[in-house]
C-alpha cells in the first residue's frame, strides 16, 4: 500500500510528515516541486492548508482594478496599518492586504528584529512572495568550511543542481544566462527586457569593467508560452502581481 504524505498547516510554513517521520521541507516555491513527483509516482498525497480558501482568479478581488478604483488610491490608512505593524514592512496596501495576516490577530514575539511575513490561506506565502529565484553556488555551499564558521554543508552544488533544474522547469524561471560561477544559471525562460535607462547603464558597465555585470532579475514568471495543464500563461507586464495574477504568470500554488 502506498504511504500517505501529509502536509501540516500552511504549505509555505510547516513540515511534511511521511511514514510518521518528520522531514524538513525545502523552502517557499520549491515545496510544490517536491510534492508533484510524489503524486506523479502514485503516492497518495494530502495537502492541508491552514486558513481560508483562495481560489485562483475567483478570490483575487482587486486583480483588475485600476489605481483610481482602489479604495484610498491604494493606500492603507494609518489606523488600519495598526493591525499590520509587522506585515507592513513588506508592502501592505489596499490592493493586497487581504492576503496578509493581521498582526493584531497573529502576532509573534520579536526580541530582535525579525520580519515574519505571513498569509494564512490556501496558497500561503506563494501569493505574496517576491518571486526572485536564484541558485546557490559553490561559494555558498562551501562558505562555512572556507571561513571556518558554523557547520559545513553536507552537500555541494553539483548534487543539488539537478533538483534546481527540475523545480525551475516546473515553476518557470525567466532570466539571462551569464555563466557566472558565483551565480549559476537556471533553466531559463526568456528574460524580461530592461528599460532604456537600464540598457544604457548595462552598456556603460560592460565598457568600463570586466568584473561587474548588470542583468535583469531572475524571477518565477512565465515570459513565453504556457505551462500545460496548470492553467498558467505568459506574463502581461501589468505590474499588479501582488493582487493575485489571473494569468497565473508568476508561480503560486493556487493555479498550479
Roles of regions detected by a PLM:
Residues 1-9, 94-101:
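Short coil-to-helix leader/linker segments, especially the first N-terminal amphipathic alpha-helix
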Residues 3-12, 19-47:
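N-terminal Rossmann-like FAD-binding beta1-loop-alpha1 element of flavoenzymes
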Residues 29-39, 51-52, 117, 161-168:
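Short, well-ordered alpha-helical packing segments
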Residues 39-61:
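Glycine-rich FAD pyrophosphate-binding loop
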Residues 34, 57, 226:
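Short glycine-/acidic-enriched loop or helix-start segments at secondary-structure transitions
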Residues 71-100, 105-115, 120-121, 129-135, ...:
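Conserved redox-cofactor binding core of oxidoreductases
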Residues 60-75:
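Acidic, Ser/Thr-rich peripheral helices and adjacent loops at domain boundaries
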